[in-house]
């Protein structure tokens, strides 16, 4: 079988103007970005406002191996399967970060014959949204340090009188806005800025700082959660970047940089329209990670897709304890649109990996034993699949399990898994997906069962309400969302929680940052752990995004490169074709 990029580069694609027209978009709704992608003007929503919403299908997964279990492949393949059944359908996915593209996982366009195309354009820059977010974010960083420098150089009173601006009196030790870049670079996690030659201060105030990956920026979350340009502007203005010497929050609005940040992101608020290999329209917008952010594509993209098609297929990052949980508890209450069906992706290798019988390490190849028949490992890993089925069902949604088939899978083990799921005393259906090898033809049974599931009545129930205290919300996610015994706040986190409550932020949602390798916060614990403690070492206020960000365990907001990064495989030939991208 050809490689992903070879399949994509030899595919016959439809011009984007035709894709958009068939979708119901007018010429003035789109701004073409070459022949096969276009920006969709957010103002199209005004024209579509009176149209009914279609069905929203949310794709999630069991606890994944480091290489993933095929959520995007299934998302794209399912959309293609629905289209082959004659349904009106679109897909919504996140824009890939170049960190993972050059790091461990490679690209995020799907794979095989279920890809978004052109995949090299999707995986590398696309229309520049992530770069715009990086620029806007670092503009705020520059504004913070410039303000500290000038106020301290002149003195607060002189600065205020000279510039007719209030002195913000930012405490340099309480700047909470790190810089960002769209690469995995562990060396930038902790840096010292503002260093000067002896006797000079021209480079600013020396202080400790650090970098996060752009996908972890609050601006990325804001882009994904904003409903229109005005909402984007207001959210950016609410961002707390530091605290002053009296312990009061300092916002981007206080720095008078929020407007310029929004201007920098003006084009980024418009989703990018692309297509699958079979011509299914696909909206690509925003790219928050699910382990260190809320892990879902944008509300704006969903809203446009739901107005234009009867079915919209989207995905939440990592397992159902991650992106799916955040879609239900953060995204859905804001969008006022809950999923109509949950599709849970499982693989034989992923179930075996959750048996706890094999060592797994990020950046390392999967053990060969995962690809061979192994009844003991398969049986031992079923607890994880059952946990994720129950987890999706607890939100009041019908669940369809999609068994993503790999070439080495045996029919005997597939049949065993099908029978096991079919015999569960739960509202769940199951089908094998061969989206990777067969495209839409490999998901026809899955598509039929998803249509059936979408016809069921749902009783969508998030884990918490806005009226609950922040502590109770954190506990709700840990206990009801993960099956933990309790949370355990560090002394620092306790102080931060008290501060946020005192400042009036108790109505915000909570966003847990933790390892995706386990339902718990310890990536070494596989299966369906119980009675564990969720340690929260630090809390961060994301007032613009509308949530409190809880750092659990040892999760990092700036990834590092593995021993053998994916960028080693990338090159370009004499004709300008990219090779080695997966």
Curated annotation (Swiss-Prot):
Pfam families: FTHFS (PF01268). The keyword Isomerase does not apply. Pathway: One-carbon metabolism; tetrahydrofolate interconversion. GO terms for biological process: tetrahydrofolate interconversion. The keyword Cell cycle does not apply. HAMAP family: FTHFS. This is Formate--tetrahydrofolate ligase. It comes from Aliivibrio fischeri (strain MJ11). The gene is fhs.
